[in-house]
Amino acid sequence: MKKNLCLLLVCLLSAAAPLQAQDMQQAQKLIDQAQKYLYNNPKQASYYAAQASALFPEDEPSEVRAQAMILYCQAEQLLGNFDLSIKNLYDTQKYIHPTNKKQMAQLCSLMGRVYSKLGDYNKAIELNDKATSIFKSIGDSTSVAGCYNKRGVMHHFMSEFTVAERFFQRALAINRAQRNLKEIATNLNNLCLYRGNTCLLYTSPSPRD
């Protein structure tokens, strides 16, 4: 009897392992799809990210689940669902491993962006500063530049145009050093709103973050 129970346990464990691997592969495929559609179809990206997140248990930390949830929140904020996005970002924190500094910084950066959309600029700047510090500590210059650009956008909407320009210039300097053409274009677009220290208020488009 004891031998039969051991055999049954081995069979169950053997059956569970491939299923877990299949779920992980499926989650990664869904995450890839979410990233693909994020900017041109955020509604579809939100769907894929939510499906990926649902593959994981609610009570277990998982960096892959955290990645899916961050994508979901990013898609929802692009859709204008800021309250839903910020709620889920807070829920995401428990799935991030304490040693994964990059993922925590990504979370803080996105939270800062959403708080900015909600008009809470003090909280937005606090989170942006935290994200910037973490990215600096791990040597991720590209993400530091991204934080500077987002910070510039925040100050633009606070009508602090001189400060905004300074952060856009910092982002541009990093992106030029790395020859990141896409982000250079974004920085230059934002800087085109300015002439020296004077904001071109007439018919100027909003800066991009």
Residues of each region from the PLM?
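Conserved small/polar residues in nucleotide/adenosyl-binding loops
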Residues: 202-209
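Conserved alpha-helical positions within TPR/SEL1-like repeat arrays
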Residues: 31, 38, 67-78, 106-117, ...
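N-terminal leader/linker segments that initiate helical-solenoid repeat arrays
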Residues: 19-70
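Short coil/turn linkers that connect adjacent helices within long alpha-helical scaffolds
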Residues: 58-61, 97-100, 137-140, 176-180
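Eukaryotic all-alpha helical interaction scaffolds
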Residues: 49, 56-57, 95-97, 115, ...
